[in-house]
């Protein structure tokens, strides 16, 4: 079975410092371990880029993180200019910056998505405020000639319909969701962690 933990009490993580994010992530892991989880997907870019190394060092359970998909965007970009829309916590993280440095020949236009997560959580996906924010965040990327937009927050795929209305059709949108699902299935199979009918665990 799958256990889904949403830390709504402490969300959003994007504006928190690394120490807070690590502490909250460990608290969440401790809760999930009490539910007999055999593998944990850290389904948050900010938590992954700030805390997953600490989690892997402290716990024996396998962790799968979700990171901004810079690699496929940079490798496939024809203009060698890509955009990334993410939280402040993700863009400031050491893990993100190490990844970005690997693609120094590609210009990466970074934009913090201030206010987006809260609007999504409040259900304001099509509000004038949301559309205004997206326009202000994406317009400089379009002007810089990006051909890929990386969504660096697990909330942002909810905004793909709105984003597509703003971006020219040739700009491709990438998020990490499908890759994380494939990696999760791979690890479950390799470690034989998939449960049978009636088995406990998540």
Where are these regions (language model features)?
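Non-catalytic structural scaffold of enzyme domains
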Residues: 1-202
